[in-house]
Amino acid sequence: MIKKIDLHTHSTASDGTFTPSEVAHKAHKTGLSAIALTDHDTINGLAEFKRACGEYGIEGISGVEISAKYEKEMHIVGLFIDENDTELAEKLDELKNAREVRNKKVLELVNGQGMEISVDNILSQKDGATLLNTGRAHIAHAMVKKGYVASVDEAFKKYLGKGMSCYVPRKTYSPKESIEMIKNAG
C-alpha cells in the first residue's frame, strides 16, 4: 500500500490558514500517514501540531522553513528537527523580532504616502495575528480593504514590492547559517 505524506505545510504560526491542530486534522481527514509542519522562520506551532498528530494517529514531523539570502532570497526547509532546541529558537526569535520592526517601518512608509493603515487593520487580516507573524501580504490586503488599491498585486507593484517606495528589506540568514541551524537542531 502506498502511503501519502506532505512534507511542506504552514500554519497560522506563520502564513498558513489553519492552526497547527487544524493542519493535523486536515491531514488525518485526507488520509495522510505523515505530515511535516514547516512554518516560516518559527517553531512555535510544533508542540501543538505534534500533540494533535498523536491524537489522530499520524506521524507528525517537526520542521521549519528558514528565510535565507545569497544574491536572491530563498527558503531552506529542515525536517526532523528538535522543536525544543534553544539555539534554533533564539535564532528564529531574532527573525521574528526583526519582522515586527520591519512591519512597523512599512506601515510608517505606507502612512507617509497618505494612506491610513493601522496595526489593527493588519491584525484583522488573520486569526491570531501579531506583528510577529504577519507581513507585507497582510498590509496589502488592508490597503485593498480600505480602497487605496484595487488588488494585492497592485499594492506590491506600486508600494510594497522590492524597489518601491514602501519596501523595507527583511532580515535573513545566509544559506550556510540556515543549514547550520537546521543541522544543529536535528
Model-derived features: positions:
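An N-terminally biased module of ancient metal coordination in phosphate/nucleic-acid-related enzymes
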Residues: 1-73, 158-165, 173-186
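Short amphipathic alpha-helical segments, especially helix-boundary/capping motifs
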Residues: 1-2, 23-27, 80-85, 96, ...
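Domain-core and long-helix interface of multi-subunit machines
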Residues: 6-14, 18, 30, 101-186
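Generic alpha-helix signal with a bias toward terminal, lower-confidence helices
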Residues: 19, 44, 49, 70-72, ...
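Alpha-helical scaffold segments that flank or form the walls of functional sites
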Residues: 22-38, 87, 94-112
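Short alpha-helical interface elements
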Residues: 34, 48, 52, 60, ...
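Active-site gating loops and adjacent loop-to-helix segments of metal-dependent hydrolytic enzymes
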Residues: 67-100, 141-164
